[in-house]
Amino acid sequence: LGSPIYLGTATGEMRSFMERLIFPYLVYDANHSTLFTKKIKTGLIYTMGAKEDQMKLMGYGQSLAIVEMVMTRIFGESESLLVTDTYQFDDYSKYESTSFNVAEKAKRRKEEFPKDCQKAFDMGVRFAQIQG
């Protein structure tokens, strides 16, 4: 599953999807059981404009860790990929956005974003091999 992070959390669409995905398998017992009978690996990919240090300072990791914990509880295993300091706009000149260093954003997009995309691809390959 994937979502951009807006205002510190995943989009409403992703939250709604996850609630509908998870709820039918919940068991309210002391063991935190699940009605999902198989074990599958799940992945969560988040993109955000915040830099890594900003993400940590604002506590994004805590809320995202809860989602990973619930996915692990229900489906067996989960991992997250956090992609930070991404583009918010294709053209920064069209928006009031003077807090961003556009040259740094462009450099990061050119140098780091392809690596993040490769990490996401590699995650998918690992999952396919495990499930295969």
PLM ranges: what are they?
Residues 1-70:
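Helix-loop-strand module that forms the ligand-binding subsite of alpha/beta enzymes
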Residues 67-132:
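Glycine-rich phosphate/pyrophosphate-binding loop and the adjoining helix
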